[in-house]
C-alpha cells in the first residue's frame, strides 16, 4: 500500500500549544503504555500495524523535516515542498515523487490522507482493502463525458 500523509500546515488549531515553530502534529498528546505520542507517530504506528510493508511518504515543508525524522524512523519517505501551495499541489508533487523517485507505477493505487486523523486501525485496514481492490483493476474509472 502506498500512502501519502499530508503534513505541510503550520497546525495553529491547537494554539497556544501549537504555532509556526511547533506544529500540532508533533506535540505528544496521545497517552500510550510507554508515555505519550504525537499525531504523526500515532498515524504512522497505526499504518504499520495494519500493513508492515506499507510505503509511507510524508508531503511536508522543509521546516518540518527534522521533526519528522526525530519522531519516526528514517525509512519513512519525505517529499519536501519547495513552498506552501495548499493541498492539491502537495498531492501532485508527492505522487510525482512516488513515480519518479520511488518507482511507483502509474497503475498502482495511492492513498492520500492527512497526518492528523483521529481514527481507529479499522480505517487503515479499510484503506488497505480499497487499495488492493483498486490494484485488481475492478474499479470503474471516473468519466467526465457527461460534462462536455
Where would I find each of the regions flagged by the language model?
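N-terminal glycine-rich phosphate-binding loop and ensuing alpha1 helix
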Residues: 1-69, 74-85, 124-125
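Short phosphate-binding loop-to-helix
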Residues: 73-105
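Short beta-strand-to-loop acidic/aromatic patch adjacent to the donor-nucleotide binding site
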Residues: 106-115
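Internal, well-ordered alpha/beta segment that forms a basic, Gly-enriched binding/recognition surface
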Residues: 117, 139-143
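Conserved donor NDP-sugar-binding/catalytic core segment of glycosyltransferases
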Residues: 133-137
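Conserved small/polar residues in nucleotide/adenosyl-binding loops
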Residues: 145-148
Amino acid at each position: 500500500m502506498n500512502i501519502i500523509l499530508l503534513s505541510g500546515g503550520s497546525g495553529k488549531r491547537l494554539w497556544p500549544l501549537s504555532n509556526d515553530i511547533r506544529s500540532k502534529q508533533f506535540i505528544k498528546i496521545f497517552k500510550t503504555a510507554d508515555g505519550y505520542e504525537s499525531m504523526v507517530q500515532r498515524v504512522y504506528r497505526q499504518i504499520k500495524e495494519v500493513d508492515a510493508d506499507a510505503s509511507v511518504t510524508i508531503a511536508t515543508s522543509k521546516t518540518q523535516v527534522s521533526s519528522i525524522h526525530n519522531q519516526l524512523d528514517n525509512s519513512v519517505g519525505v517529499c519536501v515542498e519547495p513552498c506552501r501551495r495548499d493541498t492539491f499541489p502537495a498531492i501532485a508533487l508527492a505522487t510525482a515523487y512516488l513515480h519518479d523517485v520511488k518507482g511507483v507505477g502509474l497503475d498502482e493505487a495511492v492513498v492520500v490522507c492527512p497526518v492528523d486523523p483521529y481514527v481507529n486501525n479499522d480505517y487503515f485496514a479499510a484503506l488497505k482493502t480499497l487499495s488492493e481492490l483498486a490494484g485488481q483493476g475492478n474499479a470503474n474509472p471516473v468519466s467526465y463525458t457527461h460534462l462536455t
